[in-house]
């Protein structure tokens, strides 16, 4: 015992051993999804569409779970034109029975379920003083309840079939209590998305014993159709004053970070959490917002570096 305890550890040999055990990146990023089956809620548009695209690019078989048939058919046409193996199941994630039906469809069609991404979401702009109960319920049912029970349905299948799968919940930068500057008006949406973050942590604590990785991505503003429809509804409710404040947000700022990003910027991170890259991640929420929530310096201030304000000072 004493001899073993006192034995000198060779750091170079340990490093070589670790390197030998490491999986090649080709296997992690390219080959890891081949033959895998993924279910993506809200996969017919926005972030979900880009997640489906990335999973298919890695040769996964993907099922889109969404409500609207017309939009889903257009998405299927896009993906199948590229030779991707994709199908659609009509799903209203606010209904628990639909969540379970989506998992049943996926496992019946493809014989497995390895990855779940819950990107279906609903939101709009209402002042806390104005929010109707039915709008609150709709957002909570889709954003929070839908993620919870779709995740439960997927997890039950994975546990029963001893699948060490990946579950990725989608939250939002709103979970930090942030909203459009000068406007806000998304308290109920923020509450739902904060719930998704808490759910990720606690559900992960239960499912890790089965080898299931549960993590979350919290995107900032993205250029999706929902951004424009949500704005139209708010303009009608609150008039030109709302539009003026919204339009002035960020105007005149030299900050190169866009207020809204291509959803593929987020989809790439979601994809990574679906791969062996996330094998040692449990219950984490990854913020992907381009730094838009940071306290940012709006001018390149420096008195030592040329090209900044005020620039190098003369030696005294």
Model-found features: residue ranges?
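Short, small/polar-rich loop/turn modules that mediate ligand/substrate recognition or access, typified
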Residues: 117, 208, 213, 281-283
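Short C-terminal tail/terminal secondary-structure segment
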Residues: 4-28, 271, 282-316
């Amino acid at each position: 015992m004493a001899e073993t305890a006192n034995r000198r550890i060779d750091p170079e040999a340990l490093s070589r051993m670790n390197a030998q055990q490491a999986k090649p990146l080709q296997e992690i990023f390219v080959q890891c999804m081949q033959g895998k089956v993924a279910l993506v809620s809200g996969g017919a548009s926005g972030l979900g569409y880009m997640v489906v695209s990335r999973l298919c690019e890695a040769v996964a078989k993907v099922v889109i779970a969404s409500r609207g048939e017309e939009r889903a058919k257009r998405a299927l046409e896009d993906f199948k034109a590229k030779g991707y193996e994709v199908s659609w199941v009509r799903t209203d994630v606010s209904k628990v029975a639909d969540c379970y039906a989506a998992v049943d469809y996926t496992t019946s069609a493809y014989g497995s379920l390895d990855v779940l991404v819950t990107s279906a979401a609903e939101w709009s702009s209402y002042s806390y003083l104005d929010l109707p109960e039915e709008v609150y319920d709709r957002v909570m049912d889709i954003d929070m309840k839908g993620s919870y029970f779709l995740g439960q349905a997927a997890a039950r299948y994975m546990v029963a079939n001893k699948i060490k799968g990946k579950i990725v919940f989608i939250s939002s930068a709103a979970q930090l209590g942030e909203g459009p500057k000068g406007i806000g008006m998304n308290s109920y949406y923020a509450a739902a998305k904060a719930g998704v973050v808490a759910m990720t942590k606690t559900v992960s604590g239960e499912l890790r014993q089965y080898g299931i990785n549960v993590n979350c991505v919290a995107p900032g503003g993205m250029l999706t159709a929902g951004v424009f429809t949500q704005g139209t509804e708010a303009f009608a409710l609150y008039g030109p004053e709302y539009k003026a404040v919204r339009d002035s947000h960020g105007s005149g700022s030299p900050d190169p970070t866009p207020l809204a990003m291509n959803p593929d910027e987020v989809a790439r991170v979601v994809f990574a959490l679906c791969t062996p890259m996330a094998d040692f991640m449990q219950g984490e929420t990854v913020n992907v917002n381009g730094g838009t929530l940071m306290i940012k310096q709006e001018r390149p201030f420096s008195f030592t570096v040329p090209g900044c304000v005020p620039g190098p000072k003369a030696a005294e």
